[in-house]
Amino acid sequence: MAMVEMQTTAALAESRRKMQARRRLKNRIALTLSMATMAFGLFWLIWILMSTITRGIDGMSLALFTEMTPPPNTEGGGLANALAGSGLLILWATVFGTPLGIMAGIYLAEYGRKSWLAEVIRFINDILLSAPSIVVGLFVYTIVVAQMEHFSGWAGVIALALLQVPIVIRTTENMLKLVPYSLREAAYALGTPKWKMISAITLKASVSGIMTGILLAIARIAGETAPLLFTALSNQFWSTDMMQPIANLPVTIFKFAMSPFAEWQQLAWAGVLIITLCVLLLNILARVVFAKNKHG
């Protein structure tokens, strides 16, 4: 009887060792595949960044920020008008899109919650979040540009704002939902009106998270080309008239990169480097703001 028990124990131990060996093998295979996939993705990311830096750094100069876009096959010149135009488009898109997104997020988190209207808004917002930017550009072209019968900076602002609003809505709603409900109950117990509770308590508690969403939304629209091709188009001259086509960096990069002129291509690489650095800085700033809110 003792011999049978010893054999059974030995068989169980051997079975356990084989099972553990198989698990270790599967774990090594999964880890190797994960590391290989990560290395593959990082390789291309680093390659793209290095190509952008090495090719774009040659075109960086003071003239890039002070001179206008040059005529074809002409040395010198810069991207001053394109940079100014992009700044105007992003500024106005943020001015119009951010308040709308914040107010919609407040409604979803504080007023609508699970109402049918809130569900409809969330559904539409999810569609806008996943919609290709060129679809938004075509939509604005149909309802604005085609009706006005000319391209304009305001059409570009509308397109960029439509891309920005869904991000701000989602971030605002999520940040407000993270505020403990006990704070709301305490405010109600003191007789605080709902609008006062929202402005003085929930918004104040989630302001860093909302700011993070706004920064990410700005980074999202900073390099968009497709919607601007159908709305603001471009302008090779210095112009701040939002009722007319206005120069902007993404479309200028697209135009110069597709050209056969080496001077334009060099400016295009410099423009790509500027956009890359701006988006990188915005993402870093967003992470810093969010981390400060999380640990502060």
Curated annotation (Swiss-Prot):
Cellular component terms (Gene Ontology): ATP-binding cassette (ABC) transporter complex, substrate-binding subunit-containing; membrane
Topological category with respect to the lipid bilayer: Multi-pass membrane protein
Key word Nucleus present: no
SUPFAM superfamilies: MetI-like (SSF161098)
Annotated TM spans: 29-50, 83-102, 127-146, 151-169, 205-223, 267-286
ABC transmembrane type-1 domain boundaries: 83-286
Molecular function via GO: phosphate transmembrane transporter activity
Periplasmic face residues: 51-82, 147-150, 224-266
InterPro entries: MetI-like, MetI-like_sf, Phosphate_PstA, Phosphate_transprt_permease
Predominant location: membrane
Biological process per Gene Ontology, one example term: DNA damage response
Cellular localization per UniProt: Cell inner membrane
Intervals, Cytoplasmic compartment: 1-28, 103-126, 170-204, 287-296
Keywords per UniProt: Cell inner membrane, Cell membrane, Membrane, Phosphate transport, Transmembrane, Transmembrane helix, Transport
One of the Pfam families matching this protein, by short name: BPD_transp_1
Record family assignment: Belongs to the binding-protein-dependent transport system permease family. CysTW subfamily.
Biological role: Part of the binding-protein-dependent transport system for phosphate; probably responsible for the translocation of the substrate across the membrane.
UniProt name for this protein: Phosphate transport system permease protein PstA
Source organism of this protein record: Escherichia coli (strain K12)
UniProt lineage: Bacteria, Pseudomonadati, Pseudomonadota, Gammaproteobacteria, Enterobacterales
